[in-house]
Amino acid sequence: MTVEEFLERPERWDGNHEELIEGEIYLSPNNKPRHNIVVDRIQERLQPLKKQGFVVLGEVACRVSDSSLPNTDVAVIRQDRWEANGLDNFLPESPALVVEVASPNQMRKLLNKAALYLEYGAEQVWIAYPQKRVVQVLSADGSREAREAETVEFHGIVIPVSEIFPA
């Protein structure tokens, strides 16, 4: 299925939380409070990126290919790219940084999404695992896990992993 076919479906707008990944539709459950807290904490700590010409967004759909329109939990995109696209559309490309907060049983889907984001231009993808209190940092150079006593970094903004997850 293409992005156009996905968007033209009448049932697309019935309130389901769905996304298109490599031509397949994935439904996601409603986010739990812990998920939302982690998203909020990450967004808050990324706000200094605004001074570097970035926009920090919450959930947003990103068209990364003709057959993929995944949703991010947090997206960081350059201000000029955001303004060129307009404020009422999905992003036409992969953000510079994508953050996904993992829910149980989502590992395969999140790794597929991360590979897509990186293939289509993301500098980094962070996958936060609240149950393990770990952030997996993926980039074109490889992958590493940042544990609670460690930090994650994007364009000079350093975030202690311990500040991301609620007690």
Predicted segments with their positions:
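Gly/Pro/Ser/Thr-rich low-complexity, intrinsically disordered segments predominantly at protein N-termini
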Residues: 1-167
